[in-house]
Amino acid sequence: MKDVYGRELEDLRITLTHACNFTCFFCHMEGENDGDSLLSADQISLVAQIGMEFGIRTVKLTGGEPTLRRDLPEIISKLKEVGIKEVSMTTNGYLLKELAGKLKDAGLDRVNISLHSIDPVIFKEVTGVNVLSKVVEGIEEAKKVGLRPLKLNYVVTRKNAKGIFEFINFASSSNIDEIHLIELHPVGLGKEAFYTHVDMSDIEGRLNEDCTLVEIRNKHKRPRYKCGNLVVEVVKPYANPIFCSGCNRIRLTVDGKLKTCLYRDDKIIDISDIIKSSYSTEEKEELLREAYRLAILIREPNFRFRYETSKTG
């Protein structure tokens, strides 16, 4: 089902928790405390199941830090049981050494691991914790159990911008499939940290010199480079109408709301009363269908092209 801008809905992003064992200074912090608001594995899978009727095929688990959910394997397995084609997860990697095998067995297909520096000093400055070696161990375990393609996320700030190409060399030599160089964007605490924003133009210029541009991704117009065996993708979502024009995502928040745009707080459908109610499964399913229809109806790009017209005569 398409929205009024012709965009298909394909990907459901699920915030499993606001809790995190890192304190990255630019973190989105899409909420504050979980309280009693966490959705159960059954509630999450029901929302995903109905979403499939409207085009949802893939699910990305996010946080906070999703590996802090003790029922994470159950959540993953239930999502696969209802027919989700691909379940992936964004994680800081701290607990992956212990959990990667269990999550793979539960049905997790792949991971994006947030690693914003391979310099221990800068890593601690960015994340607030001195655990770089443990994250690297988690990366190795993810490779070992087959969570592929394995991608690393690198949010570019003034603190770590000088280390980008050292990071690229590390990823290439470590048999990483892909890295995403992500422009800092002012969402949540990112608003306060936006003074550390780095213009990505110089970085792209260096990539054009040192690597090979292989494609521009069709939906979001992201440039993808080949640096040896490594794919490097540049992600610039903020104030980017091209990015928004290809958006195929909707977010399920930790407290049970369908958020139609990451950058907006005015296009939200609260479904918590539905999924936490004592209604029958059939009643919940029909109400969720109505919620999805409404969410798609009100969904619109946050950033749009502006066309100027002039009148003559």
Curated annotation (Swiss-Prot):
Pfam families listed in its UniProt record: Mob_synth_C (PF06463), Radical_SAM (PF04055)
Residues annotated as binding [4Fe-4S] cluster 2: C244, C247, C261
Write down the species: Sulfolobus acidocaldarius (strain ATCC 33909 / DSM 639 / JCM 8929 / NBRC 15157 / NCIMB 11770)
Residues that, per the record, bind GTP: R13, K60, T90, K151, R249, I250, R251
State what protein this is by name.
Probable GTP 3',8-cyclase
Catalytic activity reported: GTP + AH2 + S-adenosyl-L-methionine = (8S)-3',8-cyclo-7,8-dihydroguanosine 5'-triphosphate + 5'-deoxyadenosine + L-methionine + A + H(+)
Report the record's Gene Ontology biological process terms: Mo-molybdopterin cofactor biosynthetic process
EC number(s) for this protein?
A: 4.1.99.22
Chain residues that bind [4Fe-4S] cluster 1: C20, C24, C27
For this chain, one GO molecular function annotation is:
4 iron, 4 sulfur cluster binding
The portions of this protein that span the membrane are none
- Organism domain of life: Archaea
Enzyme class comes to: lyase
PANTHER family this protein is in? MOLYBDENUM COFACTOR BIOSYNTHESIS PROTEIN 1, MOLYBDOPTERIN COFACTOR SYNTHESIS PROTEIN A
The text of the family note is: Belongs to the radical SAM superfamily. MoaA family.
Q: In which pathway does it act?
A: Cofactor biosynthesis; molybdopterin biosynthesis
